[in-house]
Amino acid sequence: MPATRYARSGKVNIAYQAFGDGPVDLVFVPGFISHIELAWEEPYLARFLRRLAAFARVIFFDKRGTGLSDPAPGPPGLAERMDDIRVVMDAAGSERAALFGVSDGGCLCIAFTAAYPQRSASLVTYGSFARRLRSDDYPWGWPAEHLAEVLRGMDRGWATGTWWAAANPSVAADEQYQAWWARYLRAAASPSMGRGALGLNAELDIRHLLPSVRVPTLVIHRTNEQWVDVGNSRYLAAHIDGAQLVEVSGVDHRPWLGDADEILDAIETFLTGGLARPRARRHAAGAESLSRREREIVALAIAGESAPAIAAALFISERTVESHLARAYAKLGVHSKLELARRSGELGLSS
């Protein structure tokens, strides 16, 4: 795990890590809440971070009021939250960097890029939005009653994390993952801190900043995820000059779940101009490690079938397909459907 350091932002200490030796500095701004040390204990997230570090020098931090950073002395405004990016860049010795923000982290990256264009090399958002709540002229946000329902769920089940299972259906039944997620939540924020963070997100409306973004921009969204409607990213791409929109497969809001390499490949290509040569990988096990259902799903995936098509063929839910594929990828040591198909013979899988 990389060393954790602190940067001073006014009266608040911001915890950050810098790792990787790629040619591009990349500030990774997480969504909602985070814990930069516990992140390395979850295999999917740790692999996501290592993959970023393979092509960039990554600056990863906990926003004020979450994780290892100081609690916010009061409800921080957008300007304060956004300026924490500048502070960690200074501390890490980065004069100019690409910005990568997940969910509300994307909003902070957009605000930073608009305020500090000279320090922003490029912008990547994933699963983000221009406004969190629905309005007459912005129909993709959450209705106020849905926010209230989510807050009630947080109050009832913060300690277990079950209130957020709908955001990441591929791991909803994965007991090991859910146990880590519950511990991650408890370490990253108290229930009242989590409620406060979601309340701040509900107030976000950065539509007025979008015309000020003048750097190369990549907007990524999983078309079928339910936590943040894809219409949000379509709006961002339509209102940021020259932005490229990439819609990817999957149902999870967290980018490190499901086919994370589809997202990572898009980011690497955007930032570096191409993909590094595939490195030789050793798989943990072969086809014999898969359950019968996993073998069925993998065979259909190798044949080119989509998750909805596999679900229909096997009379199961798309959520179940995504969950089985994620487990199969982990067992086989592959990270995408493309790699699965390419290495099927080596892994003892028939197409």
Model-derived features with residue positions:
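Conserved acidic catalytic loop of the alpha/beta-hydrolase fold
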Residues: 79-97
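Conserved alpha/beta-hydrolase catalytic His-Asp/Glu region
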Residues: 156-200, 209
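Conserved alpha/beta-hydrolase "acid-adjacent" motif
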Residues: 226-232
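Helix-turn-helix DNA-binding segment
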Residues: 279-326, 330-332, 339-351
